[in-house]
Design a protein with these regions (language model features):
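C-terminal extensions of enzymes
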Residues: 64-109
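Shared catalytic-loop signature of beta/alpha-barrel
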Residues: 1-83
Length: 109
């Protein structure tokens, strides 16, 4: 019996697929805890009663690799007293491209 599920929304098909998986899990009483602490995960967590919490990874100096979100985007919330608050006044996911590091990456169109 599955007691909880940790899903990487980017690997299962994105936000729409994440909502579908979460709905199915909720139907069977299986809470979903999104893997990785990025804005899309925070939005999915806060949009569902079936996600009790989300992972959070503090930003620290690391080699560039899976930590692209640390460098490529700005605007992610910082937790206060163990909680994250999403700003309702910012468009989309609430993040923007960080121009400071943009030239460090090759952008393919």
């Amino acid at each position: 019996m599955i007691q909880t599920s940790s899903i990487d929304w980017l690997r299962v098909g994105g936000i729409t697929a994440g909502h579908k998986i979460n709905s199915l899990a909720e139907k069977y009483g299986v809470p979903v805890i999104p893997h990785a602490g990025q804005m899309h995960n925070y939005h999915l967590t806060m949009a569902s009663n079936n996600c009790p919490f989300s992972e959070f990874f503090p930003v620290h100096q690391v080699e560039i690799g899976n930590e692209l979100f640390y460098y490529l985007f700005k605007g992610a919330p910082e937790p206060e007293n163990g909680f994250i608050d999403l700003n309702d006044n910012t468009p989309g996911l609430g993040i923007s491209i960080n121009e400071k590091y943009k030239s460090d990456f090759k952008i393919l169109e």
